[in-house]
UniProtKB/Swiss-Prot annotation:
The organism of origin for this protein: Phoma sp. (strain ATCC 20986 / MF5453)
Underlying gene: L2
GO molecular-function term, one example from the UniProt record: transmembrane transporter activity
Family note: Belongs to the major facilitator superfamily.
Localization per Swiss-Prot or TrEMBL: Membrane
Stored Gene3D superfamilies: MFS general substrate transporter like domains, Multidrug resistance protein D
Keywords, ordered alphabetically: Glycoprotein, Membrane, Transmembrane, Transmembrane helix, Transport
Function summary: MFS transporter; part of the gene cluster that mediates the biosynthesis of squalestatin S1 (SQS1, also known as zaragozic acid A), a lead compound for the treatment of hyper-cholesterolemia by targeting squalene synthase (SS).
Membrane topology field: Multi-pass membrane protein
Coiled coil: none
Sequence intervals crossing the membrane: 83-103, 122-142, 150-170, 183-203, 212-232, 239-259, 277-297, 309-329, 346-366, 383-403, 411-431, 439-459, 476-496, 550-570
Protein name: MFS transporter L2
Xref: InterPro entries: MFS, MFS_dom, MFS_trans_sf
Residues carrying a glycan: 171, 342
Listed GO CC annotations: plasma membrane
Length: 598
């Protein structure tokens, strides 16, 4: 596909970034869990590190025997200092949410001011998502060695640099560099704030606390586009980046004053030797080499281009090499493979990727339906997504509270995937002439289902891990969701291109343009809007709706697969005593004799 310099098609990136926000929101509502109830007992493989005592795997127990075999967590009673520290984390989460959403509506103004092309605008948004995804496991691993708070500071520095560079940029290349750096900081904020909660809040209570992060993302999702639009139209698009600085300043001060965590002690050089440098290079190189062609396939280059296929093949080999290195050679692995080595964990990580695929595909392509078929503008298309965005947060909050009360999470996974399957299926009913009340209802069910799944899957993932591995499990949960989100746009794009071309070929008036029109779902929005009313425009809208229908079908099938998969996850006991050396200093239960090496 040739590089298109038509500025109007920067709309493409607008959707990408706005979805990033929503996704991040979803990513942050997540995290928390531990063991459950059942009649059998299993033993998962302990961590391979000889320096750390093997930790017993989570046990499947009946309610009665659980009290006999598992140390129970004391009632969680946070003090004012903990609450203040948590609020400081909420501030930086809100900052990340506002940044991710506000840039979406400012991109057209940025492109016009700097003379950027559609491809450059596309990468300005996508680069943030890519670096945010691939650096989450790396920053999480570093935080096990150097401490959560230190890595939070480093993430804030990256976010600061990534805010200033685009704010003073005079070309899109500089903006691309800044957004990539900002993505590293954003990924760190997403991963590390969640890991702090895992370290400081008992498993059963975590869902309630993560719901506050969800509220921050919900507010950012709604307010971000309004703020970005106001800056772009009334002041300057550069203020979309400058506005981050007050949040960074306030958040940094409050974190310094109130976030007091227990830290490991040791020489800096000794800690550097614990870093899995080879694993880090293999991981970053392989995931970058995989995600970049997945992202530009069908947008910048055709899927059958060597520029797409060669990086995919090389990165696949790199991923295999990374896994072998982690299993056989790394004394201090970047990723603890023990978090994958039980049936429930494997199924849950699979469904986490699928959840990311479905969520991202719907949040990216649904606004295109509202714009191309319903004739809405970008901001109104975002408003039309409210049935999704406004139901995700309440669904997540209610589920987190319910799991805390019941101590069970399997029911929430089943309910969430049932509603997600039903909600995705209902989208198949969308037509060009679907009424407003109808499309609002059709979007509500899926929003509730995906909202339920955020805390449900996060808690289940952590419950399936040993006590010492829960922070690692939470980190990988965030990574796999972000990984799935990147795949979601790619899979949706392939489905759209194939179905759009097939449908256009059935209309004599549009057959000659089938190849051109089917290549760019977002760019086609402007073509449809610019057409005069008539048969050709009606047929193009019909084709567009029909192509999107197959994306909803794929989402429905994947959701159904996940529903079946979650029938086989186990219920682990969630009332387990915390055992962490990184707890909040106000109520520390650290065992000095057991120092982690990760």
């Amino acid at each position: 596909m040739e590089h298109n310099t038509d500025i109007s098609t920067t709309q493409y990136n607008s959707h990408t970034v706005s979805t990033t926000t929503l996704s991040s929101f979803l990513v942050n509502v997540v995290t928390s869990s531990k063991r459950g109830n059942k009649m059998t007992t299993i033993t998962a493989q302990p961590p391979r590190d000889e320096v750390e005592p093997a930790v017993p795997a989570p046990q499947l127990l009946s309610s009665d025997s659980a009290s006999e075999l598992s140390p129970k967590a004391e009632k969680f009673q946070p003090g004012w200092r903990f609450i203040a520290a948590f609020l400081s984390l909420c501030i930086i989460v809100l900052m990340a949410a506002l940044d991710a959403t506000s840039i979406s509506v400012a991109l057209p103004s940025m492109a016009r001011a700097l003379g950027g092309s559609a491809i450059e605008a596309f990468w300005a948004g996508t680069s943030f998502l890519l670096t945010s995804t691939i650096f989450q496991p790396v920053l999480g691993s570093f935080s096990h060695i150097f401490g959560r708070k230190s890595l939070i500071y480093i993430s804030l520095v990256f976010f600061l640099a990534g805010s200033i560079i685009p704010a003073v940029a005079n070309n899109f290349t500089t903006i691309l560099v800044g957004r990539s750096i900002q993505g590293v900081g954003g990924g760190g904020i997403i991963a590390l704030t969640e890991m702090v909660v895992v370290d400081t809040v008992p498993l059963r209570e975590r869902g309630k606390w993560f719901s506050f992060f969800g509220m921050m993302w919900s507010f950012g999702t709604v307010a971000g586009p309004l703020i970005g639009g106001a800056f772009a139209q009334k002041v300057s698009w550069r203020w979309v980046f400058w506005i981050n600085l007050p949040f960074l300043g306030i958040g940094t001060v409050l974190i310094t004053v109130f976030l007091k965590l227990n830290q490991r002690h040791g020489e800096f050089l000794a800690r550097l030797r614990e870093v899995d440098w080879i694993g880090m290079v293999l991981f970053l190189g392989s995931t970058t080499g995989f995600l970049i062609p997945i992202t530009w396939g069908g947008v910048q280059y055709p899927w059958d281009s060597w520029r797409t296929l060669v990086p995919l093949i090389v990165s696949a080999a790199g991923i295999v090499a990374f896994i072998v290195h982690q299993e056989k050679f790394a004394p201090h692995p970047l990723i603890r493979t023990s978090v994958f080595k039980n049936k429930s964990a494997a199924l849950l990580y699979l469904t986490t990727v699928i959840h990311g695929i479905i969520l991202w595909a719907i949040l990216y392509f649904m606004p295109l339906y509202f714009e191309a078929v319903k004739g809405m503008g970008p901001i109104m298309a975002g408003v039309a997504l409210f049935p999704w965005t406004f139901t995700v947060a309440p669904g997540a909050v209610a589920t987190g509270i319910a799991i805390a009360v019941t101590g069970k999470y399997r029911w929430a996974n089943w309910a969430g995937w049932f509603l997600a399957t039903l909600g995705s299926g209902l989208l198949i009913l969308l037509k060009p002439d679907t009424s407003t009340p109808a499309w609002i209802f059709l979007n509500l069910v899926g929003g509730i289902g995906t909202g339920i799944l955020f805390p449900a899957m996060a808690l289940a993932v952590q419950a399936s891990a040993s006590v010492k591995d829960q922070a690692y499990a939470a980190n990988m949960f965030s990574f796999f969701r972000a990984f799935g989100q990147t795949l979601g746009v790619a899979i949706g794009g392939v489905v759209f291109q194939n179905q759009m071309k097939a449908k256009l070929l059935t209309y004599p008036l549009l057959a000659d343009m089938a190849d051109t029109y089917s290549k760019d779902a977002a760019g086609l929005v402007e073509i449809i809007k610019g057409m005069p009313a008539g048969l050709m425009k009606d047929q193009l809208k019909e084709s567009y709706t029909d192509a999107l229908k197959y994306i909803w079908i794929v989402a429905t099938v994947l959701a159904g697969v996940s529903l079946v998969a979650t029938l086989f996850i186990d219920e682990f006991d969630m009332d387990i005593e915390m055992d962490t050396e990184r707890g909040f200093k106000e109520k520390s239960k650290v065992k000095d004799a057991e120092k982690e090496t990760h």
